[in-house]
Amino acid sequence: MNDLLTRRLLTMGAAAAMLAAVLLLTPITVPAGYPGAVAPATAACPDAEVVFARGRFEPPGIGTVGNAFVSALRSKVNKNVGVYAVKYPADNQIDVGANDMSAHIQSMANSCPNTRLVPGGYSLGAAVTDVVLAVPTQMWGFTNPLPPGSDEHIAAVALFGNGSQWVGPITNFSPAYNDRTIELCHGDDPVCHPADPNTWEANWPQHLAGAYVSSGMVNQAADFVAGKLQ
């Protein structure tokens, strides 16, 4: 197997293992009652906002999958859809991304309470989203968990190539989002589809961002989220 590909797969596997450990050690909770008063929405607040974490090694922004997803979603809803690119190195630092995503969701919930939020991510960015939505306590570098009631501001969740699939759907660990989460794995993508390591190299192209776009899965996710924003 190609050395670079091997390192990437092992790194993604390690990240998935760490995430799995966090999820399995975290008690399942269902959020309730957002504390305190919230500010009224302003004209600067969009109807909806996608809060997206890009995949590993992608340049700053929301990445190939994120851009395609936002573009497709905007074409399907007659609403002002904003976008926030989660700020993190997109290497191995899931906790950095999770802290930033959580902080932004909390900020929007307070400053734009009527804005419907759509957190999501691709590959490592999906792992970032997993931590934010499924881990209600501080652990392993994640220091800014969502307060109870935050789920009231989240309309839908869109995840692509999510490594947590090795231990089960993320909705097993965050049941509050069960009916508003779409989690997609392309074919035999080795990151989200448990498989024999001997097949990883052959199946690696199925994890690439372009595969999720060209297969129609990004459009499928946009259809799902559009339905939740109606």
Swiss-Prot record:
Gene Ontology terms: cellular component: cell surface; extracellular region
PANTHER family noted in UniProt: CUTINASE 4, CUTINASE RV1984C-RELATED-RELATED
Molecular functions (GO terms): carboxylesterase activity; lipase activity
Signal peptide, first to last residue: 1-43
UniProt main location, coarse: secreted
Job description of the protein: Shows weak esterase activity with the p-nitrophenol-linked aliphatic ester pNP-butyrate. Does not exhibit cutinase activity. Induces interferon-gamma (IFN-gamma) release in animal models and in human TB patients. Also induces a strong delayed-type hypersensitivity (DTH) response in animal models.
Listed EC numbers: 3.1.1.-
Covalent S-S links between cysteines: 45-112, 185-192
Biotechnological exploitation: Five Rv2301 high activity binding peptides (HABPs) could be included as components of an antituberculosis vaccine.
Family according to the record: Belongs to the cutinase family.
Localization terms from the record: Secreted; Cell surface
Gene3D superfamilies linked to this entry: alpha/beta hydrolase (3.40.50.1820)
Biological process annotations from GO: lipid catabolic process; symbiont-mediated evasion of host immune response
Keywords, comma-separated and alphabetical: Disulfide bond, Hydrolase, Secreted, Serine esterase, Signal, Virulence
Pfam families named among the record's database cross-references: Cutinase (PF01083)
Gene source species: Mycobacterium tuberculosis (strain ATCC 25618 / H37Rv)
Protein origin, superkingdom: Bacteria
Positions annotated as active site in the UniProt record: 123, 189, 207
Protein name as it appears in the record: Probable carboxylesterase Culp2
